[in-house]
Amino acid sequence: MKTRKSHPIKRFFEQETAGGILLIVAAALAMLLANSPFYGHYDLLIDTPFIISLGDFALEKPLLLWTNDGLMAVFFLLVGLELKRELLEGELSDPRKIALPAVGAIGGMLVPALIYWWINKDNPLALSGWAIPAATDIAFALGVLALLGSRVPVTVKIFLTSIAVFDDIGAILIIAFFYTSKISMLALVVAAICCAILFICNRSGVTTLRAYLLIGLVMWVALLKSGVHATLGGVILAFFIPMTAARPHPEIKIPSPLKFLEHELHAPVAFLILPIFAFANSGIRFIGMGVEDFTHSVPVGIASGLFFGKQLGVFLFCGVCVLFGWLKLPKGMRWVHLYGVAVLCGIGFTMSLFIGSLAFQESGINSVIDERLGIVFGSLVSAVLGFVVLRSAKQKA
């Protein structure tokens, strides 16, 4: 039984880490193109308009926004499915196991946001980016852990993943409450009706995924038109997908609709959606930039929040709880592992880029460049230091 249980965990980390490495490659390729003679073609590609029409109804957006509003809704659907499964029967179903990563995640969101606020408190326009350094990119972080192989205990990977899950919950709440534009009540009513239908389907024992996905698509369009960020539709839909299916006979085993959909989405999200997102959002053109671009309060605040704030928040909040005897480190984890994980939490990348696109969507191009500079620098330094710390942990063991 023990061997069977280890397979899904092993498959999860193999897929997440491989996706993280592909994410790094996609981001590097975008930066390479943006700083090459082909940068015009890159800009033209991400700004290419795509239209979806049905009768009088039409949606027209550039590729960049289709990626951020559409593909990322599928990513958040997967995040929601993982959250529901973890809360019902996974690591997050045991309060004793979730307390320490939950505390770490809270510290890892509060301290970076405070550092960013302190650096940008005199710049009202920049303050809208306070949540950018509060995010953690689990795929990127696990990609770094993959480079360490067996040097890192599995408990360390599970602990990092648990922190990232709570981080995702925080990011979802932040997007819902702080990055919502003007509300269209009619579209919001349509979205609410979709939620009601999804609830009825769930309570009535409907297990056909097509029904949920079709209603979810209508809800996504309604949210897109309502002013509430459409990616939240993915999370809402996920929590209505049934965990179990009714058995026509006790001996007949019916697969879980939620687990089936989660399994089907993992590969497309890891190997297609997130790399496309990274490619579309990472094309920073360094040519022509001056010192003032790198020392602007926005990139400095983001980089400081990710690098200093994340490690300080996660390590300090967890450390205090362990030292006072309120909580315990997971079995097989040492203080150096906790610090290494805290540093890796500073890899914000895709989630930070996404929140940044919402925070500065009304601003000019300079704000966008400033935001991405800080994210890339803070994430890169966190990745390098986290790798060094965890690699040295094995040598000292």
From Swiss-Prot:
Its biological purpose: Na(+)/H(+) antiporter that extrudes sodium in exchange for external protons.
Similarity comment: family membership: Belongs to the NhaA Na(+)/H(+) (TC 2.A.33) antiporter family.
Biological processes per GO annotation: regulation of pH
Keyword field contains Cytoplasm: no
Key word Transmembrane present: yes
Protein keywords: Antiport, Cell inner membrane, Cell membrane, Ion transport, Membrane, Sodium, Sodium transport, Transmembrane, Transmembrane helix, Transport
Transmembrane segments: 18-38, 63-83, 98-118, 129-149, 158-178, 181-201, 207-224, 269-289, 306-326, 340-360, 373-393
Protein name: Na(+)/H(+) antiporter NhaA 3
UniProt cross-references to Pfam families, sorted A to Z: Na_H_antiport_1
GO cellular component, one term: plasma membrane
Membrane topology, from the record: Multi-pass membrane protein
Catalysed conversion reaction: Na(+)(in) + 2 H(+)(out) = Na(+)(out) + 2 H(+)(in)
UniProt-listed NCBIfam families: NhaA (TIGR00773), PRK09560.1 (NF007111), PRK09561.1 (NF007112)
